[in-house]
């Protein structure tokens, strides 16, 4: 199989990369009705599989889970989760032939095997659904021409998909129809009904393409969402300890600091995050972020280039074939870092203290978000897609670090995201070594003293922060998410 994106000519590539339309709420007036009375079979019962299924059932759809024979016979976790929640469970052979929509929610590396198994069993004219387009775009999976291929991609972990639905809300979602597989022209109707059944229409839906979703998703998770948080955690912890900070305090400042400062990001973008700082600290954070952007821009561009060309995917798939040797080695090495093994701090850190003593961390967030956004847009990805894959998901990933440090982040994210995270962080840490030697008192671990600032300089910095394209598109998109649940910040 050939990488689908690389089979397209330049005009087709640009058209698919740039496909992005914010859909009106009136387009979802029919809710999930298009799928009501039809049989939906989900393959895989992980975080996305279970939680999407729960939402879809609560929206009135007929949901069942198809699992491998051995998973059922051995009563594995997937079987237990599905049966404990009252779902019908059966083998591929028992359930797939009757399905009107088969939703493949297994991990990326299993997609080819799953599709190879279910496709011969699918009835003529059925639909195949994904929540990530890697198998179609990067692997180049060929699907029977009578089958409609659609995608509904919630921009949150599966647990959040469920929690927001239970609150009567939802999470922002991308939907798409594979242009090579829409024989009856019903792909968009299926995708809209599926998105409505998960609650995504209440938080905003982007009509996208498989290509745009994959390329932007890979870029976001490798750089700002996971790679920058991992590199920043390791660099900042080592710097604090080197400067004499108690390792336990340093660990807590970083572990919970990302979550606390990105909660402001979630509610009001980079503008609000920077407004939590004193004027002198804001000017310093801005200056640091500009330095970081200059240093890291080539690394961000390399990741985007390797994603566009398929170099990243081919390298990762080679590691799949080698029993994940690189991935598992990197995972083990990360678990042995000083940050991961530091003792816990039992004292309290106030919310504002995370901002006041985390100026460098704020600068890293600002630089990473803006660089990821800018690099995606420069590559032909529309601003709305770039926003969701950079700024929007960051607080959710930061929340995983607050639970159990980098270990938890790497457990929760997909293996694809984890592999890309290590590629980025292993390159970023040495890249920023020299920069870290120039850190001043007040940048990290100590607050910058209050003092006078130049009015004109402060005005210019405020205008630069608020005038960035991600702030403009973010203000519009956050307007659809006014009911977002607030992440509890640590003490």
Curated annotation (Swiss-Prot):
As recorded in UniProt, its EC number(s) are: 1.1.1.86
Q: Which domain of life is it from?
A: Bacteria
What the record notes about the co-factor is: Binds 2 magnesium ions per subunit.
Q: Which UniProt keywords apply?
A: Amino-acid biosynthesis, Branched-chain amino acid biosynthesis, Magnesium, Metal-binding, NADP, Oxidoreductase, Repeat
Annotated binding of Mg(2+) 2, by residue = 217, 389, 393
Identify one Gene Ontology CC term for this UniProt entry: cytosol
Domain named KARI C-terminal knotted is located at 209-344, 345-484
User: Per the UniProt entry, what are the Gene Ontology biological process annotations, in alphabetical order?
Assistant: isoleucine biosynthetic process; L-valine biosynthetic process
Similarity section = Belongs to the ketol-acid reductoisomerase family.
Q: Could you tell me what this protein is called?
A: Ketol-acid reductoisomerase (NADP(+))
Organism, by scientific name, is: Citrobacter koseri (strain ATCC BAA-895 / CDC 4225-83 / SGSC4696)
């Amino acid at each position: 199989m050939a990488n689908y994106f690389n089979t397209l000519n330049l005009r087709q590539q640009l058209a698919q990369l740039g496909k992005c339309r914010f859909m009106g709420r009136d387009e979802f007036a029919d809710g999930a009705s298009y799928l009501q009375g039809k049989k939906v079979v989900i393959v895989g019962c992980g975080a996305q599989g279970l939680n999407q299924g729960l939402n879809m059932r609560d929206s009135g759809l007929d949901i069942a889970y198809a699992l491998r024979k051995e998973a059922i016979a051995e009563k594995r976790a997937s079987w237990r989760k599905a049966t404990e929640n009252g779902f019908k469970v059966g083998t591929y052979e028992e359930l797939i032939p009757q399905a009107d929509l088969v939703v493949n929610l297994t991990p990326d590396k299993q997609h080819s095997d799953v599709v190879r198994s279910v496709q011969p069993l699918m009835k003529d004219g059925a639909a195949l659904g994904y929540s990530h387009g890697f198998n179609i775009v990067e692997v180049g999976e060929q699907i029977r021409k009578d089958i409609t291929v659609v995608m509904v991609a919630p921009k949150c972990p599966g647990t959040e998909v469920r929690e927001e639905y239970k609150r009567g809300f939802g999470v922002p979602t991308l939907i798409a129809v594979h242009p090579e597989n829409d024989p009856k022209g019903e792909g968009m109707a299926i995708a809209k009904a599926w998105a409505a059944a998960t609650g995504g229409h209440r938080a905003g839906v982007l009509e996208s393409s498989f290509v745009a979703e994959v390329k932007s998703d890979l870029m976001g998770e490798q750089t700002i969402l996971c790679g920058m948080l991992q590199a920043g955690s390791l660099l900042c912890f080592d710097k604090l300890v080197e400067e004499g900070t108690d390792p336990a305090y340093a660990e807590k400042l970083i572990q919970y600091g990302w979550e606390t400062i990105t909660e402001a990001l979630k509610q009001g973008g980079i503008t609000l995050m920077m407004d939590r700082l004193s004027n002198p600290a804001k000017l310093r954070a801005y200056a640091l972020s500009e330095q970081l952007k200059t240093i890291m821009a080539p690394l961000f561009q390399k990741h985007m280039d390797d994603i566009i060309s398929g170099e990243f995917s081919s390298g990762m798939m080679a590691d799949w074939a080698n029993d994940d040797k690189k991935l598992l080695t990197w995972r083990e090495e990360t678990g042995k870092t000083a940050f991961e093994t530091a003792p816990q701090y039992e004292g309290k850190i106030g919310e504002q203290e995370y901002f006041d003593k985390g100026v460098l961390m704020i600068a890293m967030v600002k630089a990473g978000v803006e660089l990821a956004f800018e690099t995606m847009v420069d590559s032909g990805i529309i601003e709305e897609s770039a926003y969701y894959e950079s700024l929007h998901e960051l607080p959710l990933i930061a929340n995983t670090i607050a639970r159990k440090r980098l270990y938890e982040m790497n457990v929760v994210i997909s293996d694809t995201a984890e592999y890309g995270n290590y590629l980025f962080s292993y390159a970023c840490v040495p890249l920023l070594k020299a920069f870290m030697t120039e850190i001043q008192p007040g940048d990290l671990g100590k607050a910058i003293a209050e003092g006078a600032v130049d009015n004109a300089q402060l005005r210019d910095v405020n205008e630069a922060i608020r005038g960035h394209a991600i702030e403009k598109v973010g203000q519009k998109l956050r307007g659809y998410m006014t009911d977002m649940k607030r992440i509890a910040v640590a003490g």
